[in-house]
C-alpha cells in the first residue's frame, strides 16, 4: 500500500518519476521500485517523501482496501493533465475506501436499488424527460436548491462525497458493493 500511496501523491503533485527522483536525490528507477513495492524506502527517505508531499507519514502508510472503480461516469474539465487525472482517480478510490470502512461500523442499510434509477437515453429530448422523472422520484421542484437536492439524494441512499482537489472536476458517480456514490468537487 505504501507504493500505491507514494504514486498517488506523486501524481497529485503533478510530478514525473524523474522530477520526484531529482528532488529526493535518487534515481527514477528507485522511485519506480518504491511505487511497485519491490523496494522500501528507509525511515529517513520516508520522512523526506512525506515532507516533499506535505503529508504525514501515516498518510503514506495508510492501508485501506481500495475498490476497483471503472471511472466510466467521470466528468473532468478539459484542462486537467493525464497525470493529475490519474492522481485524482487514486484519491477518489481512497476516499471511497475510507467511506466503505466507516460504513462497516454503521448499523444502517445503505444498499441501493439501481434498477429504480436506470434510464435509457437516446436523444437530448430523453434527458429532459428523465430529469423531470427523477425530480418527481425525489420530490423536488425545478428550482430546487443544491443543498436540498443533496439531502433528497441522501434520503434515497445515494452516498455523496465532496473532495477537495486543487483542480476542479465536474463530478463522478460509481456503483460499488451495492452502494451508489456521487463524488463532487
Q: Residues of each region from the PLM?
A:
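Short juxta-domain linker segments that transition from a proline/glycine-rich
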Residues: 1-22, 26-185
Amino acid at each position: 500500500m505504501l507504493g500505491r500511496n507514494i504514486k498517488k501523491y506523486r501524481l497529485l503533485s503533478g510530478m514525473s518519476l524523474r522530477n520526484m527522483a531529482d528532488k529526493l536525490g535518487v534515481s527514477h528507477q528507485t522511485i519506480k521500485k518504491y511505487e511497485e513495492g519491490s523496494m522500501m524506502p528507509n525511515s529517513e527517505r520516508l520522512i523526506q517523501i512525506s515532507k516533499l508531499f506535505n503529508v504525514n507519514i501515516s498518510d503514506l502508510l495508510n492501508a485501506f482496501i481500495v475498490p476497483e472503480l471503472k471511472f466510466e461516469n467521470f466528468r473532468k474539465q478539459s484542462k486537467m493533465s493525464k497525470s493529475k487525472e490519474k492522481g485524482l482517480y487514486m484519491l477518489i478510490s481512497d476516499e471511497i475506501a475510507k467511506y466503505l470502512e466507516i460504513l462497516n461500523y454503521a448499523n444502517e442499510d445503505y444498499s441501493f436499488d439501481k434498477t429504480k434509477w436506470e434510464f435509457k437515453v437516446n436523444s437530448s429530448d430523453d434527458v429532459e424527460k428523465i430529469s423531470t422523472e427523477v425530480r418527481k422520484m425525489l420530490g423536488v421542484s425545478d428550482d430546487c436548491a443544491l443543498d436540498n437536492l443533496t439531502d433528497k439524494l441522501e434520503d434515497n441512499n445515494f452516498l455523496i462525497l465532496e473532495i477537495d482537489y486543487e483542480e476542479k472536476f465536474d463530478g463522478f458517480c460509481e456503483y460499488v458493493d451495492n452502494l451508489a456514490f456521487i463524488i463532487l468537487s
